[in-house]
């Protein structure tokens, strides 16, 4: 897995932040896309139609001549699941603008698939953009917005208590 370092080029102004900043938290069930619009973050939830993992609970023998659970490690259902997952990752990748600073976050391997797909799309049109990848558990919307602000150098919002 290749990940951009935090010292790479970051947008300087609020206008750059508004045009280029996006954070994607993704797993097989959904993606949460956090994008700047002026002074606020716009949050979009994308649900997937990826079927759940079907895990065997014990040995299943289909053929007495084949040992330990059957001839193929992947069932037909698992292959279909991966096809659905690839379509979902493509749909999320196509929602991101080409000039945005991208932060991809997730707790499984789906965020790595999204990173690979974004890099593949970038190489097809001979461009490069900053893609920062991090493994993380599920976070609240506020935590995702704060992480995007931190990556873009905007810092947390400060409010005065009382007046």
Give the ranges of each region predicted by the language model.
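Terminal alpha-helical anchor/extension segments at protein ends
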Residues: 1-163
């Amino acid at each position: 897995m290749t990940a951009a370092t935090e010292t790479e080029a970051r947008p300087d102004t609020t206008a750059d932040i508004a045009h280029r900043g996006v954070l994607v938290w993704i797993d097989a069930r959904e993606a949460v896309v956090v994008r700047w619009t002026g002074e606020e973050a716009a949050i979009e939830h994308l649900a997937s139609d990826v079927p759940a993992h079907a895990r065997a609970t014990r040995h299943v023998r289909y053929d007495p001549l084949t040992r330990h659970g059957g001839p193929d490690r992947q069932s037909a259902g698992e292959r279909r699941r991966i096809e659905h997952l690839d379509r979902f990752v493509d749909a999320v990748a196509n929602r991101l603008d080409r000039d945005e600073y991208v932060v991809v976050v997730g707790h499984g391997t789906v965020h790595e698939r999204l990173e690979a797909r974004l890099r593949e799309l970038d190489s097809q049109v001979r461009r490069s953009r900053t893609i920062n990848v991090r493994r993380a558990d599920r976070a609240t919307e506020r935590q995702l917005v704060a992480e995007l602000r931190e990556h873009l150098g905007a810092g947390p919002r400060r409010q005065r208590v009382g007046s």
